[in-house]
Regions:
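Intrinsically disordered, low-complexity segments enriched in Ser/Pro/Gly/Ala and basic residues
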Residues: 1, 5-7, 59, 77
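A broadly tuned "polar low-complexity/structure-edge" signature
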Residues: 2-3, 21, 55, 63
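N-terminal first-folded block
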Residues: 3-43
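Intrinsic-disorder/low-complexity, polar/charged segments enriched in Ser/Thr/Lys/Arg/Asp/Glu/Gln
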Residues: 21, 48-52, 84-86
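Amphipathic, hydrophobic secondary-structure cores in small proteins
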Residues: 26-79
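Core SAM-dependent methyltransferase catalytic element
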Residues: 86-92
Length: 92
C-alpha cells in the first residue's frame, strides 16, 4: 500500500480553479505582500495572458481590485471559497 497521494488527492489539495498561463499562491501573506508579489509575477507573462492568484488575507479583494485598476490590468475573477480568495488577472 502506497502513502503517496493519488492524482485526484493532489488535485483536491490544489485550490487553483482556472487554466491560466501563471498560477501563484500567496496564502499566509499579509497586505501588501500579495499585491507586491502579484506585480512581480505578472512580469513573467506577456500582455493579454492571464494569471491566477490565491490569497487568504481579508484585505486582498480590495487590494487586488485597486492594484488592477491603477496598473491597467483586468480583474476577471474575484471569488472566495472556504476562506481562500481566488483572483484571475489579465495582464495589460
Amino acid at each position: 500500500m502506497s502513502d503517496k497521494p493519488s492524482p485526484s488527492d493532489k488535485q483536491a489539495e490544489t485550490p487553483f480553479q482556472h487554466d491560466c498561463s501563471l498560477q501563484a499562491d500567496f496564502r499566509g501573506l499579509k497586505c501588501p505582500l500579495p499585491v507586491l508579489k502579484a506585480r512581480r509575477s505578472l512580469g513573467q507573462i506577456s500582455s493579454g495572458q492571464e494569471a491566477e492568484f490565491l490569497a487568504d488575507d481579508p484585505a486582498s479583494p480590495l487590494d487586488m481590485a485597486h492594484f488592477c485598476e491603477t496598473e491597467g490590468h483586468t480583474l476577471l475573477v474575484s471569488d472566495e471559497r472556504g476562506g481562500i480568495f481566488i483572483f484571475v488577472v489579465k495582464k495589460k
